[in-house]
Curated annotation (Swiss-Prot):
PANTHER family: PYRUVATE, PHOSPHATE DIKINASE REGULATORY PROTEIN 1, CHLOROPLASTIC. Its EC number is 2.7.11.33, 2.7.4.28. It comes from Cupriavidus pinatubonensis (strain JMP 134 / LMG 1197). Transmembrane segments: none annotated. This is Putative phosphoenolpyruvate synthase regulatory protein. It catalyses: [pyruvate, water dikinase] + ADP = [pyruvate, water dikinase]-phosphate + AMP + H(+); [pyruvate, water dikinase]-phosphate + phosphate + H(+) = [pyruvate, water dikinase] + diphosphate. One of its GO terms (molecular function) is ATP binding. It is an enzyme of class 2 (transferase). Belongs to the pyruvate, phosphate/water dikinase regulatory protein family. PSRP subfamily. Residues 1-24 have a biased composition (Low complexity). It holds the Pfam family Kinase-PPPase. The lineage of its organism: Bacteria, Pseudomonadati, Pseudomonadota, Betaproteobacteria, Burkholderiales. InterPro entries: Kinase-pyrophosphorylase, PSRP.
C-alpha cells in the first residue's frame, strides 16, 4: 500500500503516524461567490431569505436575479446561465429557489450548483406535519391585487407620499404613525417602508430650528402626540449625509448638526416621545422597533 504524498515543501509524516487531512490552500476559493435567485414569481421571497442567510458570512456575493421562471423551458435557460458561471469561475454557484412547477424544478436540479430549495425545505415537512397538501400555486403570496389588504397598502403609500416632510397637515388623524426628527435622519425611507411593507399610513415631519427656538413641537402635531415616534442620528453621521446634498453649507456644518440633534432629542424627552437613533440601524430594524412601540388597529401584514 503506497504512502500518502505530502504537499510540496511539507515533511512526510513519521512512520506509523496517523495521516492528517490536508488543509485547503489559501486562495483555493474565490473572494466573490455567484448566487442565483430563481423564482417563478417576483423573487422577493427568495431574495429576502437569501439576504438573511448570506449576511451571516463575511464574504462578497454577486447576486443574479432570475424572476418569472415558471416553465421548464425557462428553467433550462436558467440552467445554461448557472452552468456558464460554474465553468467560468470553477466553483458551483449557490442557487436559492422557490419554484413551484415540478417540471421546472426538476430541470433546475440539473444545474452544476448548490441548490437551496425553500419549498422542499419548508413546505414538504409542513405537508407531512399538517396532513395537508399545499396548493403549489405559483406566486400565490403576491396574487393579491384585488384584496382589501392590497388596496390598503396602495392607500398607505399614497398617504405617506402626500405627508412626506410635513408637506400636508390634512387627515393626520388617519395616520398610524407620525415620524419626527431633524432633516436627513431617515424619516422618509422609514415612512415609505412602513407603508409598502406593512400597509401603515406613516407621515413624517421635520423638526427645524424654528421649533427649537419655540421649544415646542410643530403646532400641527399637538393633537396627535400618541402617534408620534422620533428618529435621531449621530451628528457626525448627519454632517456626512448633509454634505452629500449641500456641501460646505451651514446646514451641513458639524456645529449646526450637533445643535439640531441635541435640541431635537431634548424636545422629544420633554414631550415624552419615544425615539431611537437611526445611526447604526437598517430601515428594517427601525421599522420593526416602531411596530413594537406603536399600537396599530389594522393588521395588513
Amino acid at each position: 500500500m503506497s504512502e500518502p504524498v505530502a504537499p510540496d515543501g511539507a515533511q512526510p509524516a513519521p512512520a506509523g503516524a496517523t495521516p492528517q487531512p490536508l488543509q485547503p490552500i489559501a486562495g483555493d476559493r474565490p473572494a466573490t461567490r455567484t448566487v442565483f435567485i430563481v423564482s417563478d414569481g417576483t423573487g422577493i421571497t427568495a431574495e429576502t431569505f437569501s439576504h438573511s442567510i448570506l449576511a451571516q458570512f463575511e464574504m462578497r456575493f454577486r447576486k443574479v436575479r432570475m424572476p418569472f421562471v415558471d416553465t421548464p423551458e425557462k428553467a433550462h435557460i436558467a440552467v445554461g446561465k448557472i452552468n456558464e458561471a460554474f465553468h467560468t469561475e470553477g466553483v458551483p454557484p449557490i442557487v436559492f429557489t422557490t419554484l413551484v412547477n415540478q417540471e421546472a424544478n426538476k430541470a433546475l436540479r440539473r444545474a452544476k450548483a448548490m441548490i437551496l430549495d425553500m419549498f422542499q425545505t419548508f413546505i414538504e415537512p409542513l405537508e407531512k406535519e399538517l396532513g395537508l397538501k399545499s396548493t403549489h400555486a405559483i406566486g400565490r403570496f403576491h396574487q393579491n391585487a384585488d384584496t382589501e389588504a392590497y388596496k390598503n397598502r396602495i392607500e398607505a403609500i399614497n398617504f405617506s407620499l402626500a405627508h412626506d416632510d410635513g408637506q400636508s397637515h390634512k387627515n393626520l388623524q388617519e395616520a398610524d404613525v407620525i415620524l419626527v426628527g431633524v432633516s436627513r435622519s431617515g424619516k422618509t425611507p422609514t415612512s415609505l417602508y412602513l407603508a409598502m411593507q406593512y400597509g401603515l399610513k406613516a407621515a413624517n415631519y421635520p423638526l427645524i430650528p424654528d421649533d427649537f427656538e419655540r421649544g415646542k413641537l410643530p403646532k400641527a402635531l399637538y393633537d396627535y402626540k400618541p402617534k408620534i415616534f422620533g428618529l435621531s442620528i449621530d451628528p457626525q453621521r448627519l454632517t456626512e449625509i448633509r454634505n452629500e446634498r449641500r456641501p460646505g453649507s451651514k446646514y451641513a456644518a458639524i456645529e449646526n448638526c450637533r445643535y439640531e440633534v441635541n435640541e431635537a432629542e431634548a424636545m422629544m424627552r420633554r414631550e415624552g416621545i419615544k425615539w431611537l437613533s437611526s445611526t447604526h440601524k437598517s430601515i428594517e430594524e427601525i421599522a420593526t422597533t416602531i411596530l413594537q412601540e406603536i399600537k396599530v388597529d389594522r393588521d395588513n401584514y
